[in-house]
Amino acid sequence: MTTSDLPAFWTVIPAAGVGSRMRADRPKQYLDLAGRTVIERTLDCFLEHPMLRGLVVCLAEDDPYWPGLDCAASRHVQRAAGGAERAGSVLNGLLRLLELGAQADDWVLVHDAARPNLTRGDLDRLLEELAEDPVGGLLAVPARDTLKRSDRDGRVSETIDRSVVWLAYTPQMFRLGALHRALADALVAGVAITDEASAMEWAGYAPKLVEGRADNLKITTPEDLLRLQRSFPH
């Protein structure tokens, strides 16, 4: 499938979190990664894609860092209010897309602000494999290590069959209308939503797993940032 044959898409980047585990003086999406902020590098892969229709970044109301970035002035990038949790931020982002003219059956990709190493190859693979899918899905990586389940005392209770276990990554790609309904209903029901796929699962769907690269890391600890520094030229 050529690039022009890939489906057009919108993107939502939830970026209202603080990232307290980084022990930094600012949210992790604004930390330096080889001369640019993490979030700028995260946005690059989407803004450089010819099938992108538009991108919404969900930000804390008092965010002092975003306005100073070059990407904040891009005509392809819009801002939405961040929520108290990820699900609320994404829901606000979807509503902003509807205001921008997105339709219920349009594809939306939700991606972590602190996951800056997404490759064009992985993005295109996700778009291609899900282009005709009735549900949508997500980038994921098969578990490679032996997995153990613990009891309440921190002792092994069983070994889990890793052949059926995947690590959920982003982007996660769904139809705007279906994802909006799933998130809104889950929030009303008080369901704990950790990612968009979990909302779709709760709504009765079975998202497709699309294998991606393991180095599409989400920055969670200072060690993650140091590891990714080696992936970007200075």
From Swiss-Prot:
Pathway annotation: Isoprenoid biosynthesis; isopentenyl diphosphate biosynthesis via DXP pathway; isopentenyl diphosphate from 1-deoxy-D-xylulose 5-phosphate: step 2/6
SUPFAM superfamilies: Nucleotide-diphospho-sugar transferases
EC number(s) per entry: 2.7.7.60
InterPro entries given in the database record: IspD (IPR001228), IspD/TarI (IPR034683), IspD/TarI_cytidylyltransf_bact (IPR050088), ISPD_synthase_CS (IPR018294), Nucleotide-diphossugar_trans (IPR029044)
Enzyme class: transferase
Disulfide bonds: none
CDD domains xref list: CDP-ME_synthetase
UniProt site (Positions MEP for the nucleophilic attack): 162, 218
Site location (Transition state stabilizer): 21, 28
GO biological-process terms attached to the record: isopentenyl diphosphate biosynthetic process, methylerythritol 4-phosphate pathway
Keywords in alphabetical order: Isoprene biosynthesis, Nucleotidyltransferase, Transferase
MF (Gene Ontology): 2-C-methyl-D-erythritol 4-phosphate cytidylyltransferase activity
Domain of life: Bacteria
Catalytic reaction list: 2-C-methyl-D-erythritol 4-phosphate + CTP + H(+) = 4-CDP-2-C-methyl-D-erythritol + diphosphate
Function: Catalyzes the formation of 4-diphosphocytidyl-2-C-methyl-D-erythritol from CTP and 2-C-methyl-D-erythritol 4-phosphate (MEP).
HAMAP family (UniProt xref): IspD (MF_00108)
Family, as annotated: Belongs to the IspD/TarI cytidylyltransferase family. IspD subfamily.
Protein name: 2-C-methyl-D-erythritol 4-phosphate cytidylyltransferase
Organism listed in the record: Pseudomonas aeruginosa (strain ATCC 15692 / DSM 22644 / CIP 104116 / JCM 14847 / LMG 12228 / 1C / PRS 101 / PAO1)
Encoding gene, per UniProt annotation: ispD
